[in-house]
């Protein structure tokens, strides 16, 4: 195979793995807002499912700051690294029990 064909095949495999972003209703968004606020107040660890360019990613950590202006959460992960989460990318939040 030629290099171009291999590149195209790889891209086709990636594109075939992509999913559509799930839509959230107002109730789900409100529940996530409450969960994030409580986790910030009581320093609880959360598991986030994030939609990013057709793929779902998982982030686990503690919310340290909510930036309403930029619509981002500042989350310290389990390695003490700061992860910036775009609020529009969140598709699920649960406590990490």
Swiss-Prot record:
It comes from the Bacteria. InterPro entries: YolD (IPR014962). PANTHER family: IG HYPOTHETICAL 15966, YOLD-LIKE FAMILY PROTEIN. This is Uncharacterized protein YozL. The lineage of its organism: Bacteria, Bacillati, Bacillota, Bacilli, Bacillales.
């Amino acid at each position: 195979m030629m290099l171009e064909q291999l590149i195209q095949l790889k891209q086709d495999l990636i594109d075939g793995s992509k999913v559509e972003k799930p839509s959230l209703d107002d109730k789900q968004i409100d529940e996530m807002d409450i969960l994030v606020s409580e986790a910030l107040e009581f320093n609880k660890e959360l598991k986030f499912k994030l939609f990013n360019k057709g793929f779902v990613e998982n982030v686990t950590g503690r919310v340290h700051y909510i930036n309403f202006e930029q619509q981002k959460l500042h989350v310290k992960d389990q390695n003490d690294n700061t992860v910036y989460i775009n609020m529009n990318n969140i598709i699920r939040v649960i406590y990490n029990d």
